[in-house]
């Protein structure tokens, strides 16, 4: 990083009241600031108890000051942490004092971004920091910690090293074209390529599972009014999150709820009736429902077998994307005999279910996990993101194209290897555009 990087400061603890509040500061040559804050010269990595004072020497608070000298710190710069009482007024006064002493307010994720730019961690590890903070369940937290500790990165670095080794062999063939030697055959380049393809496939499979655990499954409930959508949402959530009445059309806005099934987050939207209306408020709810449908992975199509596929349900089905996966739910199974087969909703799976008794809920949950592609937590999994999966798919494609190259297409073979390496490098940040970095770190919380 440049020598002209400004000092940054932010509250590192969550907003609100608490027993302890932490101010984090990062920059160059912070000992003078530490002395101005507490009147003492702190030793690195030793907790210093002191009064934190304002410009007039009046105490703002008392607590611990921790000093981490560069480069042995999270960001790779000098870092100060002020640990005081966790009241919002105290935190604001301490932060303002830091700003008076020359710091500026940190941007979201800026501490972690500096750690990345100073080679304290790579991009996949940096994302692991945010994913650990945002983990939706225990499984996600465990896998995010593995990514933060570098498990995912080591797998990627292994792929990159293999690609570099193979590229060196290919470059040798390009450097000595006059030699009557089949370099690719002599160096077993084909065998090495096959090994790399298997390794990419393995990492991709793990990344896809990690992405499911991080990002979950988007599900919409659709069906005619009063068919039991809100009752099903409440049953899945285990709480009264949606209003249930005998009056058709009670739900006038999309109701969203997140549940965990075997640690996998499932984002469920109970849609307002997908129909035309002159009611302004209801129209807004319907537009939100249509947006939820466009973003969904699975639609639960609720049908009352006593009525079958009525005209209202047919109209709703016509609004669904043709490629959207569907599960047909025969609702209110406690009130009727199970119907044989489906009603032509386009669903491959039919489940009879009663939101009132809970009959069929477990079968629905298992089916949702199957639709998500979740295979269960296993050793070696790590949390991943969609961008990681896409990068690995790109590398997989380039290696597949390399395998199609003939023995006299060495330059094309080498180019596919290079592009596969670039795709892998995008995951760890070796080859990453600045605008993508901005997007990634802007989604962090301030102070991290």
Swiss-Prot record:
GO biological process, one term: tRNA methylation
Subcellular locations according to the entry: Cytoplasm
Cofactors required: K(+)
One annotated Gene Ontology cellular component of this protein: cytosol
Pfam families: MMR_HSR1 (PF01926), MnmE_helical (PF12631), TrmE_N (PF10396)
Bound cofactor: record note: Binds 1 potassium ion per subunit.
InterPro entries given in the database record: G_TrmE, GTP-bd, GTP-bd_TrmE_N, GTPase_MnmE, MnmE_dom2, MnmE_helical, P-loop_NTPase, Small_GTP-bd
Residue span(s) of domain TrmE-type G: 216-373
Positions bound to GTP: 226-231, 245-251, 270-273
List of residues binding Mg(2+): 230, 251
Binding site for (6S)-5-formyl-5,6,7,8-tetrahydrofolate: 24, 81, 120, 448
UniProtKB keywords: Cytoplasm, GTP-binding, Hydrolase, Magnesium, Metal-binding, Nucleotide-binding, Potassium, tRNA processing
List of residues binding K(+): 226, 245, 247, 250
Gene Ontology molecular function terms on file: GTP binding; GTPase activity; metal ion binding
Keyword Cell inner membrane: no
TM stretches of this protein: none
PROSITE patterns assigned to the protein according to its UniProt record, in alphabetical order: G_TRME (PS51709)
Primary site of residence: cytoplasm
EC number(s) from the headed UniProt entry: 3.6.-.-
Function according to Swiss-Prot or TrEMBL: Exhibits a very high intrinsic GTPase hydrolysis rate. Involved in the addition of a carboxymethylaminomethyl (cmnm) group at the wobble position (U34) of certain tRNAs, forming tRNA-cmnm(5)s(2)U34.
Subunit structure: Homodimer. Heterotetramer of two MnmE and two MnmG subunits.
Family matches, as NCBIfam families: mnmE_trmE_thdF, PRK05291.1-3, small_GTP
Family that this chain belongs to: Belongs to the TRAFAC class TrmE-Era-EngA-EngB-Septin-like GTPase superfamily. TrmE GTPase family.
Name the record gives this protein: tRNA modification GTPase MnmE
Source organism per UniProt: Neisseria gonorrhoeae (strain ATCC 700825 / FA 1090)
């Amino acid at each position: 990083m440049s020598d002209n990087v400004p000092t940054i400061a932010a509250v590192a603890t969550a907003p609100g009241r608490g027993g302890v509040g932490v101010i984090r500061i990062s920059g160059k040559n912070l000992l003078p600031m530490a002395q101005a804050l507490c009147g003492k010269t702190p030793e690195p990595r030793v907790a210093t108890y002191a009064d934190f004072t304002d410009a007039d020497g009046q105490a703002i608070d008392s607590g611990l000051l921790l000093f981490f000298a560069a480069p042995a710190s999270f960001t790779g710069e000098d870092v100060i942490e002020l640990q005081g009482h966790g009241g919002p007024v105290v935190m604001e006064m301490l932060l303002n004092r830091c700003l008076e002493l020359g710091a500026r307010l940190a941007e979201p994720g800026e501490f972690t971004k500096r750690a990345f730019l100073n080679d304290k961690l790579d991009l996949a590890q940096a994302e692991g920091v945010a994913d650990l903070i945002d983990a939706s369940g225990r499984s996600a937290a465990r896998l995010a910690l593995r990514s933060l500790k570098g498990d995912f990165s080591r797998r990627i670095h292994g792929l990159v090293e293999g690609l570099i080794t193979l590229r060196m062999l290919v470059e040798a063939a390009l450097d000595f074209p006059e030699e009557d030697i089949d370099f690719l055959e002599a160096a077993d380049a084909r065998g090495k390529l096959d090994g790399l393809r298997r390794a990419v496939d393995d990492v991709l499979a793990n990344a896809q599972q990690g992405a499911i655990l991080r990002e979950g499954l988007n599900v919409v409930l659709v069906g005619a009014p009063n068919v039991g959508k809100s009752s099903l949402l409440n049953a899945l959530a285990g709480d009264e999150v949606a209003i249930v009445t005998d009056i058709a059309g009670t739900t006038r806005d999309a109701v969203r709820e997140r549940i965990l099934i075997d640690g996998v987050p499932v984002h469920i939207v109970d849609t307002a009736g997908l129909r035309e209306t002159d009611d302004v408020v209801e129209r807004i709810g319907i537009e939100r429902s249509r947006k939820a449908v466009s973003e969904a992975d699975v639609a639960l199509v609720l049908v009352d077998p006593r009525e079958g596929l009525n005209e209202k349900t047919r109209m709703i089905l016509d609004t669904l994307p043709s490629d959207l996966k569907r599960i047909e739910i025969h609702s209110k199974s406690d009130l009727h005999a199970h119907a044989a087969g489906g009603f032509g909703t386009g669903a491959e799976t039919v489940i009879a279910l009663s939101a009132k008794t809970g009959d069929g809920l477990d079968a629905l949950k298992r089916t949702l996990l199957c639709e998500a592609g979740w295979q269960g937590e296993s050793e070696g999994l790590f949390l991943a993101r969609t961008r990681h999966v896409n990068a690995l798919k790109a590398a997989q494609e380039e290696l597949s194209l390399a395998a199609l190259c003939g023995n006299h297409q060495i330059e094309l073979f080498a180019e596919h290897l290079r592009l596969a390496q670039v795709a892998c490098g995008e995951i760890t940040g070796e080859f990453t555009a600045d605008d993508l970095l901005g997007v990634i770190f802007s989604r962090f919380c301030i102070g991290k």
